[in-house]
Amino acid sequence: MSIRTLPVLLAITAGLAVNAAQAATTGTLRFEGLVNAGTCNLAAGDVNRTITLPAVKISDFDSSPFAGAHNFEVSADCESDIRNVTFLFTGTPSTGNGLIFNNTGTSQGTGLWLVHRTTPVSTIPANGTPAQRSRTVATSSNKAILPLQAAYHKTSGAITQGTLISSMTVAITYN
């Protein structure tokens, strides 16, 4: 084999290697994902909660339409991008006073008065529109805290001894 034929053989062999690389298949990788907004949930202790009011006497209503006020809070745990939480309360109004939530206990003439503890205090009416039954709170440190107060309240007729039992649903929306 002469030295002159070696470059020709190398050129032919190199061409074969290029053809082999060109014969490989190609593809496209596509990546998809979803970026969701943060979420908010009622705090675990507020999902199914019993709030016990202090015992009162019938005579406590002699000079006031309400008695036994008890402060408490309802809160929501939120992710860092949530700025505001709206709490919506829904329950059955009392037949004697539609602003007051119905008492299914044994005491007659009483219902539950729910108040947002602001200055001045603001009743959350059982028979109100959704806007009247809602309160919006800004989040702080990934939490929204709504300060509330509940109390026994006269409805109509004579007040009798017995229990006060009142239930409502709280739902939250957020942004």
Region roles according to the model:
Residues 9-17:
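Bacterial N-terminal signal peptides
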Residues 2-6, 19-175:
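Mature extracellular/passenger domains of Gram-negative fimbrial/pilin and adhesin proteins
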